[in-house]
């Protein structure tokens, strides 16, 4: 963990050693997530931090088509940070999920300042999301074939069902009782 930084108020100091309770900053390129535990070889098991199914959704696209890669990169990194939940369907459409409207404003501001991307946020027919688990590969393949237009992946590549309404979700759950539809996902 080279270049770890001890954080105290406005002070920053490079440190070689940290002990339990120290708050340090670690330069990260997507390998570490909020709540990860670092040890020197011990195998520890903790319950993860839950991600909750978002309640608000927007579709995002760049105003400048030449900045689509920056938009994808920015949203992926912000999703990894936990600033917002990002879902991508098979066609490459990006859906942002939040528990409050302020999250969209923060993401828009950060995309503009940190990634130089001016994005358009549009209403979307998505009203709720559920993480999916399957009992076997056969069920997974059949479900994905039938529900292709409602499926996406989250920032970590986990399968997600994007329902257009609670009725749509309940109908799909009745039709597919063996598929697990989860309101939370453990990180």
PLM regions and their residue ranges:
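Conserved nucleotide-binding/hydrolysis modules and their immediate coupling elements
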Residues: 1-57, 69-73, 80, 90-93, ...
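Short glycine-/aliphatic-rich beta-strand segments at the starts of folded cytosolic domains
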Residues: 50-64, 122, 127, 131
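Charge-rich, low-aromatic oligomerization/scaffolding segments with amphipathic character
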Residues: 36-39, 102-116, 171-174, 184
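A common structural junction motif
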Residues: 42-46, 78-83, 111-120
